[in-house]
Amino acid sequence: MKKRIRELTDLLNQYRQEYYTNDAPSVSDSEYDKLYRELVELEQTYPAYILKDSPTQLVGSTILTGFQKYQHQYPLFSLQDAFSREELNAFDQRIKSAFPEAEYLAELKIDGLSISLVYEAGVLKVGATRGDGTIGENITENIKNIKDIPKRLSQALDVTIRGEAYMSRQAFKTINEERQENGEPEFANPRNAAAGTLRQLDTRIVAKRQLATFLYQEVGLETADSQQKTLERLADLGFSVNSHYLLSSSMNDIWDFIQSIEASREELPYEIDGVVVKVNQLAIQEELGFTVKAPRWAIAYKFPAEEKEAEIVSVDWTVGRTGVVTPTANLTPVQLAGTTVSRATLHNVDYIAEKDIRIGDTVVVYKAGDIIPAVLRVVEAKRRDQAPMPIPTACPSCQSQLVHFEDEVALRCINPLCPSLVQRSLEHFASRQAMNIAGLGPAVVEKLYSAGLVHDVADIYRLSLEDLLTLDGIKEKSAEKLLAAIEQSKANSAEKLLFGLGIRHIGAKASRLILEAYGDLEALLAVTAEELAQIDGLGLVIGQSLVQYFQQEQAAQLLAELKSAGVNLAYLGQRPDQQAALFGLTVVLTGKLEKLNRTQAMEKLEQLGAKVTGSVSKKTDLVVAGSEAGSKLAKAQQLGIRIEDEDWLLNL
């Protein structure tokens, strides 16, 4: 069971990164949810085996490059998902058993990108993406180019507003028509288009693409006593608020509303993927609180994905950077979710065996997250006399013997010199989330590798203009740009480099946590797995994987070569000061401050080592209360939590 929990944790973390960070999931929502539920059940049965990097303990995605990081004043949580009436009923029973008077507000789940807007004295100061729920991207200039977001409020408020940025169906159609005319690749769906737009560095493009928003949450003020009144207040302040919602104490009414919305969703001018059900009374929300991942007072009902039938014509097998061999089905073309689909992932050999998928089968295809086509099941009634799927025994790239480890679902090539494995590793190193070397994509990597110019990541920093000009299709101007991008990457903070090395289990978030703790990549040559496991957010498996990598002689040699080439090995971000006055304390701000605005107060608390949260609980160590403090102060007094005022904070 321990191995299965580790395997599920790794798989789900990979899929989370694909969905939240790259906006390109490789598995369907339903496949992800099936694996997630299996993990939840195993963790409930074997709680001692819960890993610190388990997706059940995490929120959202990791940070991308290209924009400054932004530390959220209050975490942005994910939502618990539901896929059936029974799950909604279970949610209802859990809530009503503790709070019989609870009402629900059902709101549309907009298929967009979560945003957070910070206002100081009524002026928009920061617009940010969710990121991993704690650290997002500062996209303020792009946010200011969304027409329906107020730049200044009618009241001088210090407040954070949360919601979704999206692209309407009409705007999506227009932009894809323009891209088609210009010979550019079309966006797969409006969510992808919205995500790509918000990450544009040219703000004129953002303004042109006509993004819109729906806002639904107010954080940091205590001016409303219900979710419905919060929506009304947001509308009064000038925000766009979705008018399709239902208030009821009956889950029967909520279910009728969900069914009605699902039946008419295609008539809406924007895309939705479900309905969010929230406890309406904010006082009850406060009492229910949060798990590490999601609020206990809300649940998201997800609509099933669109499905179509297609025939499998053939199967391609490709090798990834970790050696995993992935099967992809070539299909008879079919229209699915607005695009023509002719290829779909088959995930792995265990999935093929479990579904008994064969070449020539008619299969049901759907889009994972409305993006990546995947095979869901075989239409047994249409099967003829097809033979079972031939499974390769040799690597399609290097012809080495493939292995299928007992605790894994995939075939794997374990030849470290496999051309596909090496090339995918180089592509990963150059990717946006890693070293962000613009121009070093798959086509250029293949040319460099085939020419014998690069075999590992250190070779990238040995490339010269003369080397690049020997390659087909590489002109002097593009070669100079690539060399400039390589040179620029040398100055990256070391967590980008650590992630780019592609060490198993070491994702972008783990890389940041490790470098925050140790400060320098060379320090990792002497750490132990047990020491690494003490870092909050990591586990022993991550520690063991990192130590195993850096114990190799070639790892020390690689670091030496990178350092000699001028690549930065130090962490450039802010590291926690364990001697700070409030280090390790969980602090809540409430009420109106006279001398500091809320952002200044939060920054001061964080500089003093505190973790600032938005709600009072038994885990809260300290409450800093201003004038007109409301329910948070009362709850802190009830729980016997230490309470201080603004002057106390200023004097620290």
UniProtKB/Swiss-Prot annotation:
<dbReference type="GO" id="GO:0003677">
    <property type="term" value="F:DNA binding"/>
</dbReference>
<keyword id="KW-0235">DNA replication</keyword>
<dbReference type="Pfam" id="PF12826">
    <property type="entry name" value="HHH_2"/>
</dbReference>
<dbReference type="GO" id="GO:0046872">
    <property type="term" value="F:metal ion binding"/>
</dbReference>
<dbReference type="InterPro" id="IPR041663">
    <property type="entry name" value="DisA/LigA_HHH"/>
</dbReference>
<feature type="domain" description="BRCT">
    <location>
        <begin position="577"/>
        <end position="652"/>
    </location>
</feature>
<keyword id="KW-0436">Ligase</keyword>
<feature type="binding site">
    <location>
        <position position="418"/>
    </location>
    <ligand>
        <name>Zn(2+)</name>
    </ligand>
</feature>
<dbReference type="InterPro" id="IPR010994">
    <property type="entry name" value="RuvA_2-like"/>
</dbReference>
<dbReference type="InterPro" id="IPR001357">
    <property type="entry name" value="BRCT_dom"/>
</dbReference>
<protein>
    <recommendedName>
        <fullName>DNA ligase</fullName>
        <ecNumber>6.5.1.2</ecNumber>
    </recommendedName>
</protein>
<keyword id="KW-0479">Metal-binding</keyword>
<dbReference type="InterPro" id="IPR013839">
    <property type="entry name" value="DNAligase_adenylation"/>
</dbReference>
<keyword id="KW-0227">DNA damage</keyword>
<dbReference type="InterPro" id="IPR001679">
    <property type="entry name" value="DNA_ligase"/>
</dbReference>
<dbReference type="InterPro" id="IPR012340">
    <property type="entry name" value="NA-bd_OB-fold"/>
</dbReference>
<feature type="binding site">
    <location>
        <begin position="78"/>
        <end position="79"/>
    </location>
    <ligand>
        <name>NAD(+)</name>
    </ligand>
</feature>
<feature type="binding site">
    <location>
        <position position="413"/>
    </location>
    <ligand>
        <name>Zn(2+)</name>
    </ligand>
</feature>
<keyword id="KW-0464">Manganese</keyword>
<keyword id="KW-0234">DNA repair</keyword>
<feature type="binding site">
    <location>
        <position position="278"/>
    </location>
    <ligand>
        <name>NAD(+)</name>
    </ligand>
</feature>
<feature type="binding site">
    <location>
        <position position="395"/>
    </location>
    <ligand>
        <name>Zn(2+)</name>
    </ligand>
</feature>
<feature type="binding site">
    <location>
        <position position="164"/>
    </location>
    <ligand>
        <name>NAD(+)</name>
    </ligand>
</feature>
<comment type="function">
    <text>DNA ligase that catalyzes the formation of phosphodiester linkages between 5'-phosphoryl and 3'-hydroxyl groups in double-stranded DNA using NAD as a coenzyme and as the energy source for the reaction. It is essential for DNA replication and repair of damaged DNA.</text>
</comment>
<dbReference type="Pfam" id="PF03119">
    <property type="entry name" value="DNA_ligase_ZBD"/>
</dbReference>
<dbReference type="InterPro" id="IPR013840">
    <property type="entry name" value="DNAligase_N"/>
</dbReference>
<feature type="binding site">
    <location>
        <position position="302"/>
    </location>
    <ligand>
        <name>NAD(+)</name>
    </ligand>
</feature>
<dbReference type="InterPro" id="IPR004150">
    <property type="entry name" value="NAD_DNA_ligase_OB"/>
</dbReference>
<dbReference type="InterPro" id="IPR004149">
    <property type="entry name" value="Znf_DNAligase_C4"/>
</dbReference>
<dbReference type="GO" id="GO:0005829">
    <property type="term" value="C:cytosol"/>
</dbReference>
<comment type="similarity">
    <text>Belongs to the NAD-dependent DNA ligase family. LigA subfamily.</text>
</comment>
<dbReference type="Pfam" id="PF03120">
    <property type="entry name" value="DNA_ligase_OB"/>
</dbReference>
<feature type="binding site">
    <location>
        <position position="107"/>
    </location>
    <ligand>
        <name>NAD(+)</name>
    </ligand>
</feature>
<keyword id="KW-0520">NAD</keyword>
<dbReference type="InterPro" id="IPR036420">
    <property type="entry name" value="BRCT_dom_sf"/>
</dbReference>
<dbReference type="InterPro" id="IPR003583">
    <property type="entry name" value="Hlx-hairpin-Hlx_DNA-bd_motif"/>
</dbReference>
<feature type="binding site">
    <location>
        <begin position="29"/>
        <end position="33"/>
    </location>
    <ligand>
        <name>NAD(+)</name>
    </ligand>
</feature>
<dbReference type="GO" id="GO:0006281">
    <property type="term" value="P:DNA repair"/>
</dbReference>
<keyword id="KW-0460">Magnesium</keyword>
<keyword id="KW-0862">Zinc</keyword>
<feature type="binding site">
    <location>
        <position position="398"/>
    </location>
    <ligand>
        <name>Zn(2+)</name>
    </ligand>
</feature>
<feature type="active site" description="N6-AMP-lysine intermediate">
    <location>
        <position position="109"/>
    </location>
</feature>
